[in-house]
Amino acid sequence: MFYKGIKVLSLFFIDEVDHYRKYDESGNPVNGIFADMFEQEYEDVLQNLQLKIGEDDYLKYLQSISAEKTHAGYFSIDKKGRMINSKIKRSETSSDDVDAYDLIMKNKELLLDRNPQKSPVRFIFSHSALREGWDNPNVFQICTLKQSSS
């Protein structure tokens, strides 16, 4: 898709926000287990990527984006500016994740921009289903991550 000018996005739905983003004692954001795993796996894949002849531009593109910058979380935000779990009522199938929804909708053009300095994000983590209307055609992978207890 890269050579057709399409930026591919991947969407991860996760069970708990703190699996993606936590906060230290001073309130500074730090990676949760899923963000750490993602960055480790991303680096491993990038180092072991075997491309075909003529795919040098794609490799340069990937190498121009750090693992830390190629993913982002879109979650509800509390009054302190911290990411929090969305509340889903039993009778609803969507969440009150208004901040996440607005952020994705308002920055849709930027999100699709292939310039890695302007828009490095290609992997999006969210706590709950996005409301109708987020019809981004560039999302080709959607998965659910949930920490198991076994």
Residue ranges and their predicted role:
Residues 140-150:
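Catalytic or ion-translocation cores adjacent to nucleophile or general acid/base/metal-coordination motifs
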Residues 1-124, 132, 148-149:
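Conserved C-terminal RecA-like helicase domain
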Residues 8, 136-141:
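Short glycine-/polar-rich loops that comprise or flank the Walker A/P-loop
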